[in-house]
Amino acid sequence: GWLKKIGKKIGRVGQHTRDATIQGLAVAQQAANVAATAR
């Protein structure tokens, strides 16, 4: 029923959040590498 629908929505949001977090970490890692190389 509607509970399952809401659960699916929350799951999708969680997936997006996780993807964004992983992407953000990757970008931060790259920036750290660039900073280390620039020194």
From Swiss-Prot:
Cellular component, GO annotation: extracellular space
Keyword tags: Antibiotic, Antimicrobial, Immunity, Innate immunity, Secreted
Keyword set includes Cytoplasm: no
Induction description: By bacterial infection.
Gene Ontology biological-process annotations: antibacterial humoral response; defense response to Gram-negative bacterium; defense response to Gram-positive bacterium; innate immune response
Places the protein is found: Secreted
Pfam annotation, one family: Cecropin
Function: Antibacterial peptide active against Gram-negative bacterium E.coli. Has no activity against Gram-positive bacterium M.luteus. Weakly active against M.luteus.
Similarity annotation: Belongs to the cecropin family.
Record's protein name: Cecropin
Lineage: Eukaryota, Metazoa, Ecdysozoa, Arthropoda, Hexapoda
